[in-house]
């Protein structure tokens, strides 16, 4: 009797353990939520997509927890921008085989699309701060998920990796990629139409994140408060922005939900400029088939609501 109970317990344990292992392994892990938006569209109905960075946290200063490292180790596929953006992931991802990772910044179709970072506006930082800035961002703007063109290339790369890992799901993965590309084309048209009347309206953003989106849709930023949001803008930079606000050269200044807007509020105080919020991470959007398109539309609405004065 005891022997039968032992065998039954062992069988149940194996089944439960096997199921848990399968659930833990059957996942795409994306570094940041917008990267997860792209991945979840391609993996929809095939495997789970999870996001490493918690809502409300910033990719600029996050530290991995032991549970995060386990998630990376157990993932079927890890998708991230690269060490210039998610420095906190560099060590564990470097131990993963190439077949189990997509590094967006290193994709051959993405490299020609990379934009240079803008450092010139922050010359009043001291030398130590400047060095930290350059180390963190490198030569290029790494907010790559804000480019629909790069998002399209990322989706193709994720599709290719998942087909290699899960060839039995090729038909579904093919359909998902086709749907994503069609949605993206439609959203680009819709966003372009919404933002077209706003070309020529000047504004300041909190940090140098939005260049890809702004270039694609013809927006005209006057500048940013800081290149790296971990570093407070210097007094000279704040004075320059304040002067342009007083002279009514800008319609809006934009803060971000991941950082306290005190410095933005103080510079705008007493002027007629409007304040808005841009969320470069799509914090309130859930992963799903249409989440990347929702993200682009939300960002466009955030620009438009302030620039139009709605």
UniProtKB/Swiss-Prot annotation:
Record's subcellular location: Periplasm
Protein name, as recorded: High-affinity zinc uptake system protein ZnuA
Signal peptide location: 1-26
Transmembrane segments: none
Stated induction or repression of this protein's expression: Maximally induced 30 minutes under zinc-limiting conditions, still induced in stationary phase.
Cystines in this chain: 252-306
NCBIfam families in the record: PRK09545.1
Species this chain originates from: Escherichia coli (strain K12)
CDD domains membership: ZnuA
Binding annotation for Zn(2+): 59-60, 143, 207
Similarity comment text for this entry: Belongs to the bacterial solute-binding protein 9 family.
Superkingdom classification of source: Bacteria
Gene that specifies this protein: znuA
Keywords from the named record: Disulfide bond, Ion transport, Metal-binding, Periplasm, Signal, Transport, Zinc, Zinc transport
Role, per record: Part of the ATP-binding cassette (ABC) transport system ZnuABC involved in zinc import. Binds zinc with high affinity and specificity and delivers it to the membrane permease for translocation into the cytoplasm.
Listed GO biological process terms: cell adhesion; zinc ion import across plasma membrane; zinc ion transport
GO cellular component, one term: ATP-binding cassette (ABC) transporter complex, substrate-binding subunit-containing
Primary location class: periplasm
Recorded GO MF terms: zinc ion binding
